[in-house]
Amino acid sequence: MIELKNVTFGYPGTMRDIYEDFSISLSENKIYGLLGKNGMGKSTLLYLICGLLRASSGKITVDGYDAQLRRPEMLREIMIVPEEFELPKVTLDEYVMINAPFYPRFSKDVLVNCLQNFELPLSLRLDQLSMGQKKKVYMSFALAA
């Protein structure tokens, strides 16, 4: 369950808050969509839920964990694929060897299956991919984690 209670957030230097006294409860085992125009706060909401941004007031919990604390127990349950990011200059196989231990439920079988669907080999170098391919790799890793 993801809960936001009376959350207020605005970026420093802006005149108004993006979220003001915002509350919502998202139940488990349901699929939700997040729709809106560019610049309306969709990514901001996801970053708040992941604890990557801090609300100026209110409380955000993921499965009962305070999102701002970014506890490992919470991070096992949630992953965000950011719009812009850099991947290291390693092969995907090396990336998996480095990062998979942080995700106890990581499944290499799931990763390989996702990559096959995207027609991407495990031996590819991450720094040589297009942004679209990098996002596919990141999403595959997220699903496997």
Residue ranges of model-derived segments:
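ABC-family P-loop ATPase nucleotide-binding domains
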Residues: 80-138
